[in-house]
Amino acid sequence: MDRHLFLFGGGPPFTSKLAKQFAKQVSTHGGKVALLILERANWQEYMPKYTNTLMEQGIREFNYIPLPTVSAEEASRILRNSSGIIIGGGNTELYAEFIVKTPISKVLKEQFSDGVPIAGFSAGSLICMDKCIVSAKDNADQVFKYQAGLGLLKDTVIAVHFSEWIEESHLRKAVTLFQPSLNFGIDEGTGLYFLNNKLIGREGNGVFRLKNNQLEKIEMQL
């Protein structure tokens, strides 16, 4: 099965063309989307930011999985019955704790391999990688951190909120440490679409990469 991965450099919403592409893949699997998010006060009020652009594309069924309130077992059941999966933004280390380090991770990998599209926003994008790399600007200790991710995209490192947080030095550190084949700095309001581990389109603001030790902007559009 084709594997569809959407990585956004900030919070929701989906960009318009990527929303259309995500919804297209969801519809081929039945049309039901699950949202993995962190439990926080009034979280329900924030959900339309994720769902409105998909509703415009005809998606009507959404199942919300606030963690850790919903158990890993119940979350896994919902995910197995989903046609598309969104991993939200927030505290990256908590997303890793409640998803990567639990049985939820196995279900996500299985669904992804079976062709169910997965979209990550900010922290959700970071945990999709083989190495979940957390910026010093994104944790209480204010240090560069990394841990295992879901491994949906391998041999690649990313930095999110790239221009907004001035993250070139962070991306350089990640590239130097892990020597990946590919690297991307993704701005807010920007998404990348990977089909079978290959970048085939982007939409939104800036996407950057380090090539021959020089930072360059990627101009590809969807």
Predicted segments with their positions:
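Short glycine-rich anion-binding loops that position phosphate/pyrophosphate groups of nucleotides
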Residues: 11, 89-92, 124
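Class I SAM-dependent methyltransferase SAM-binding "motif I" and its flanking Rossmann-like core
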Residues: 96-98, 105-164
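Class I S-adenosyl-L-methionine
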Residues: 39-77
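Flexible gly/pro-rich beta->alpha loop and the following alpha-helix that scaffold active-site loops
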Residues: 64-117
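C-terminal and late-domain segments of enzyme folds
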Residues: 1-28, 38-54, 134-222
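Residues at the starts of beta-strands that form the adenosine-phosphate
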Residues: 4, 32, 61
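Structural motif
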Residues: 6-7, 84-88, 119-120, 158-159
